[in-house]
């Protein structure tokens, strides 16, 4: 499956890229070790192993400074509640590589795409159309509609006693 004609651009692949049949081309493809541990089906494993054996895929980890950038962004947007540690590492690796060259992340994960868009990092989908807008998350009272910070620890509104839920908000 061919995503784009730019073979020399650095690409960071998450598990959904392999699972959805993306075959890395060129030599500038990267992923993190934890992504390789998420690959379980035979076809995806073959794509991954072939790319590693043929030198089309490199496994590397993000630097601590890049992970801090990711943690700050996802804390502010609320995506911290929806991203796994592996997802955060994939985004962190893209931030690490971005300082040197153009980088694109291959992912069908909408939450990863949301964070990448907030950080100004390009992405491509394999099977989905990808996101168009960015979103953040809020905690909102279902009764009086008061907005609470994401780290508000109670489940009931201090004003009216109604339930507090998480809601997506378009930026």
Swiss-Prot record:
Keywords associated with the record: Endonuclease, Hydrolase, Manganese, Metal-binding, Nuclease, Ribosome biogenesis, RNA-binding, rRNA-binding, Toxin-antitoxin system, Zinc
Gene Ontology molecular-function annotations: magnesium ion binding; RNA endonuclease activity; rRNA binding
UniProt GO BP: maturation of SSU-rRNA
Cofactor binding, per record: Binds 1 zinc ion per subunit.
Record region (Zinc ribbon): 136-171
Binding site for Zn(2+): 141, 144, 157, 160
Domain PINc per the UniProt entry, residue ranges: 9-114
Keyword rRNA-binding: yes
Protein name in UniProt: Endoribonuclease Nob1
Origin species: Methanothermobacter thermautotrophicus (strain ATCC 29096 / DSM 1053 / JCM 10044 / NBRC 100330 / Delta H) (Methanobacterium thermoautotrophicum)
Gene: nob1
């Amino acid at each position: 499956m061919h995503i784009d004609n730019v073979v020399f651009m650095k690409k960071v692949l998450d598990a959904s890229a392999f699972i959805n049949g993306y075959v890395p081309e060129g030599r500038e493809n990267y992923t993190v070790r934890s992504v390789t541990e998420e690959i379980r089906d035979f076809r995806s494993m073959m794509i991954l192993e072939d790319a590693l054996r043929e030198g089309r895929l490199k496994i590397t980890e993000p630097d601590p400074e890049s992970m801090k950038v990711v943690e700050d962004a996802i804390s502010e947007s609320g995506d911290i509640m929806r991203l796994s540690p592996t997802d955060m590492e994939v985004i962190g690796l893209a931030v690490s590589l971005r300082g040197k060259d153009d980088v694109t992340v291959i992912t069908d994960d909408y939450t990863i795409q949301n964070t990448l868009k907030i950080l100004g990092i390009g992405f491509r989908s394999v099977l989905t159309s990808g996101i168009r807008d960015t979103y953040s998350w809020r905690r909102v009272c279902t009764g009086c509609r008061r907005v609470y910070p994401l780290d508000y620890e109670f489940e009931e509104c201090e004003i009216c006693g109604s339930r507090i839920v998480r809601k997506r908000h378009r930026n």
